[in-house]
């Protein structure tokens, strides 16, 4: 970047420009790219041999136009899994512990390692979407039920701040739990209980 050869164009792709060093940003011109539309995302997935079908709008909402992330979610059953997580969160405060336990138990054992990874990632995504919704971000929702849950649990910037703080705390807690090999089912259930406690606290 400091001394590129003549007539050379370097494209630096970054999803979080604010995290780049100032010395890098000062040498770059910004070209902001919008997320792919649903139609373009569908075409990109089709070109990669992935058929999204009826899940395309939900994929677009969760992946914000990223074809690679959409393909990964399709391959891992991420859309129905996210719907299951949001169905549990829709009961907060006072969420269905039996449903939370059932999902947590599905994460145990070496054969379910991928499910464990996906559940963690999608729970954190759900909390992040709660924070963004309360902060006023214009989110495309997975379905009507998700939109209602986001609006009820995170109606304003104050609740958004609480969810953002919780997301940061749970991200660190989950990373530590995995590092020390805690029981997956207990770790996931504990995560749901923290979410329920935050919802109860915000409900006053």
Q: Where are the regions that the model predicts?
A:
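Charged, glycine-rich active-site and insertion segments that engage polyanionic ligands
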Residues: 6-9, 15-122, 127-129, 133-204
């Amino acid at each position: 970047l400091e001394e590129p050869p003549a007539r050379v164009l370097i494209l630096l792709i970054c999803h979080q420009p604010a995290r780049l060093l100032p010395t890098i940003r000062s040498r770059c011109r910004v070209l902001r790219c919008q997320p792919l539309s649903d139609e373009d995302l569908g075409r990109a997935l089709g070109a990669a041999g992935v058929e999204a079908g009826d899940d395309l709008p939900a994929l677009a909402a969760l992946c914000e136009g990223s074809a690679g992330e959409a393909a990964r979610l399709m391959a891992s059953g991420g859309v129905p899994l996210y719907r299951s997580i949001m169905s549990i969160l829709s009961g907060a405060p006072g969420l269905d512990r039996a449903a939370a336990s059932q999902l947590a138990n599905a994460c145990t054992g070496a054969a379910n390692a991928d499910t464990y990874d996906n559940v963690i990632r999608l729970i954190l995504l759900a909390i992040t979407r709660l924070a963004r919704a309360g902060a006023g971000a214009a989110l495309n929702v997975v379905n009507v039920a998700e939109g209602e849950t986001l609006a009820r649990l995170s109606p304003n910037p104050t609740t958004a701040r609480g969810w953002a703080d919780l997301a940061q705390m749970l991200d660190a807690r989950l990373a530590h739990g995995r590092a020390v090999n805690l029981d997956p089912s207990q770790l996931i259930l504990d995560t749901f209980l923290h979410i329920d406690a935050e919802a109860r606290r915000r409900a006053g």
